[in-house]
Amino acid sequence: MTLLPATLYAQIEQSMPIACVDFVLVRPKSGTTSLTEVGLILRHSPFGEVWCHLGGRIQRGETIAQALRRHAREALDVDLKLPRDIQPSYVYQWFPPDIAPSDGTLHGDDPRKHAIGLSFVVDFIGTPMPQGEALDVGFFSIENLPAPLWPGCEQLLRRLFRQPSS
């Protein structure tokens, strides 16, 4: 695969939305079979060190499943259990503040780019080991998320797990 020069990619990022995958790992809460914990990573961001879901852009020629697996490997060295034709559970938008919608559209904050996040809840295989952008990994109940979270991440998680906003 040919990668774009950094300057050209930066120009593209400033000119159009970027297709991304956003996902959280899930596992049963310790001692239960019905409650779920979500896996989040701690990472550097424009907001300092924050907890957030995993994900990133989809590369040209890459399927959604391949993008999900690549980001899981690069951040946590795990594989994912995915159906053959995986479909997003939610589509979430991320905007820089200067172009963020003011009409009440739910969105996350990303000062770097406008992104369309195909969002997933996925099972994984292996033991998560933080690497690459992941400084740490933790599993949390949706009712007890860590702080600080990337702005918009909590709203995305609540939509993925159909929880009311706090």
Feature locations, PLM:
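Residue-level signal for short segments within beta-strands and strand-turn junctions
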Residues: 25-27, 42, 124
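Active-site segment of metal-dependent pyrophosphate-handling enzymes
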Residues: 77-127
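A structural signal for short, well-ordered beta-strand segments
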Residues: 23, 68, 118-122
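NUDIX/MutT-family hydrolases
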Residues: 119-121, 129-162
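Conserved Nudix-box catalytic region and its N-terminal flanking loop in Nudix hydrolases
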Residues: 33-79
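Short helix-loop capping/hinge motifs at secondary-structure junctions, enriched
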Residues: 31-32, 126-130
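Acidic, metal-coordinating catalytic segment for phosphate/diphosphate chemistry
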Residues: 1-31, 102, 109-110
